[in-house]
Amino acid sequence: ASSVADARAMIAAMPPGKTLAINWPLRWVKSHVTAKRLVDEGLIGEVIEIHSYGGNRGPLYHLADKIEVSREEVERQKPTSWWYKRASGGGSLLDYLGYGATLGTWYRNGEAPLEVTCVTDETPGIEVDQHAIVVCRYATGLSKMETRWGTFTDPWMIQPQPKCGFVLVGTEGTIASWDYADNVTVQTRAKPEPHPIPADPLPPRGRNAIEYVLGCIARNEPLTGPLDPATSLTGQRIVDTAAESARQKRTLPLMP
């Protein structure tokens, strides 16, 4: 959705007996699914911090057929490109914060933050942000969600530094789950040295949104996780509050 109001309207429009699903492609990344399993199994205790970093080199690098564009040409196009227009909903925050906010809500079993603070870059001649840092205050402490148009490399090709993905901090350990990785890296009280755990293969009928939704319908089960409208609504509330926080340059309570 483009706003909390639109998200609530979508939920209200869902006919009785029908299913509304919101697809997040990162939900089908096996490392992130494995991280959720380990959290649910209690490996790291209660999740008390989430750090996410999401982005890419920038939208103008990704033309049809993945035609490569030079950095000089990208910079030349930025001031006039619709990607970089506020009225078009441009910017790294609106592009990527939904992933960190929604999957972060999933990892926290639906818990919402109390307050949100967001700071964005302000590049002369560019209407929208290319870098946003969002701090969410939860009852258990702070979490950080960062978005970037301008990573050194695209994470689906070569993971940049900082790496794109999630670090989950729990009362009994930590999990680092990077986008598109074949394993997660774990610390626990029993084994504090960071060590890899192989990512689980995605199960049959759970490899993508269509398989998952059809399976839930066939089993008469509700959707869970990021595809659940309630989880995505919390993510949207974080996004909208962050955008308004950046505009007002102050901390705000989470939007209802």
Language-model segments: residues:
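Predominantly a Rossmann-like dinucleotide-binding segment in NAD(P)-dependent oxidoreductases
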Residues: 18-21, 26-124, 249
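ADP-ribose/adenylate-binding Rossmann-like module
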Residues: 1-3
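Alpha-helical structural signal in soluble globular domains
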Residues: 6-16, 38-41, 137
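C-terminal helix-rich "cap/oligomerization" subdomain common to oxidoreductases
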Residues: 6-12, 19, 127, 212-256
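A short helix->loop->beta-strand "cap" motif at the edges of active sites that frequently abuts
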Residues: 16-18, 141-142
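Contiguous beta-strand/loop segments that form the cofactor/metal-binding neighborhood of enzyme cores
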Residues: 69, 95-183, 200, 207-222, ...
